[in-house]
């Protein structure tokens, strides 16, 4: 199932097959992804290509310094003598949060809180986000102008973070020849419910659980100031299950 998706995405995003697989594994595990790279490196194109090939609804939010929380979450308006809630772009399966660290801390916080809770609270009313729901966020390096760094407590909400690979000469030639015609490479939509059933059946041995705890203990021994959260440990296991499914296996190795 995923071989075709990976093949299609690789037609427009060359030289990043491992990151494509890692992103799909995170999405299967209902985790969110943070891509950090320089402007013009293809972050947005990469994220769009992933979403188009999953057959899920998605919307893009361009973060800027003047973006308000209500521009993301939604707001109430008075219509026909009553308040009606107008949903923001966060009400979709996949949100592409473009240049997240260009937004104000207030907008970042509101967005990431909704991402964590998978719901939006406005004027005392709570609105659930669609299922499945996850975020593919991009950000520019901290030394780029107009950026504000995300605190560790917010970075912890992302399952994985990476930069895109540098292309070799052959890959650059292929990119220049083929361009970024994303609309022509869409795959068949995946069955999300079947996928979640399959994920629950993935076997994880006690040795794998012990190995994850060993990773935590090693990190702590190297730097006592680094805290490995329980959420992080769980996400490692979930990501491993997603990685197994991407590779057509029903067990974690």
Cite the ranges covered by each PLM segment.
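Pre-Walker A (pre-P-loop) alpha-helix and adjacent loop at the N terminus of AAA/AAA+ ATPase modules
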Residues: 1-41
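Conserved alpha-helical scaffold flanking the Walker A/P-loop in AAA+ ATPase domains
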Residues: 21-25, 76-96, 100
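Walker A/P-loop
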Residues: 24-64
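Walker B catalytic acidic pair
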Residues: 37, 98-99, 110
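P-loop (Walker A) phosphate-binding loop of NTP-binding proteins
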Residues: 38, 72, 138
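Short beta-strand-centered segment that lines the nucleotide-binding/catalytic pocket of NTP-utilizing
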Residues: 57-69, 124-128
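Canonical AAA+ ATPase core
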Residues: 79-82, 99-107, 115-189, 194-201, ...
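Basic, amphipathic alpha-helical bundle interface domains used for macromolecular binding and assembly
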Residues: 179-253
């Amino acid at each position: 199932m995923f071989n075709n998706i990976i093949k299609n995405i690789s037609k427009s995003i060359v030289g990043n097959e491992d990151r494509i697989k890692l992103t799909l594994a995170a999405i299967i595990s209902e985790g969110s992804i943070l891509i950090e790279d320089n402007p013009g490196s293809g972050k947005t194109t990469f994220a769009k290509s992933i979403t188009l090939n999953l057959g899920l609804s998605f919307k893009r939010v361009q973060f800027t310094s003047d973006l308000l929380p209500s521009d993301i979450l939604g707001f109430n308006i008075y219509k026909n003598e009553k308040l009606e809630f107008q949903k923001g772009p966060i009400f979709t399966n996949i949100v592409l949060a473009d240049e997240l660290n260009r937004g104000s801390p207030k907008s970042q916080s509101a967005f990431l809180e909704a991402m964590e809770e998978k719901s939006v609270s406005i004027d005392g009313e709570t609105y659930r986000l669609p299922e499945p729901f996850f975020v593919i966020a991009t950000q520019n390096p901290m030394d780029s102008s107009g950026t504000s760094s995300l605190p560790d407590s917010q970075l912890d909400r992302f399952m994985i973070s990476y930069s895109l690979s540098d292309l070799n000469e052959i890959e650059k030639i292929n990119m220049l020849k083929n361009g970024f015609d994303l609309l022509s490479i869409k795959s068949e939509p995946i069955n999300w419910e079947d996928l979640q059933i399959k994920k629950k059946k993935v076997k994880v041995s006690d040795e794998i659980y012990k190995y994850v705890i060993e990773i935590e203990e090693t990190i702590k021994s190297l730097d006592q100031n680094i805290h490995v959260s329980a959420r992080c440990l769980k996400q490692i296991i979930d990501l491993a299950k997603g990685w197994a499914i991407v590779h057509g296996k029903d067990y974690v190795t």
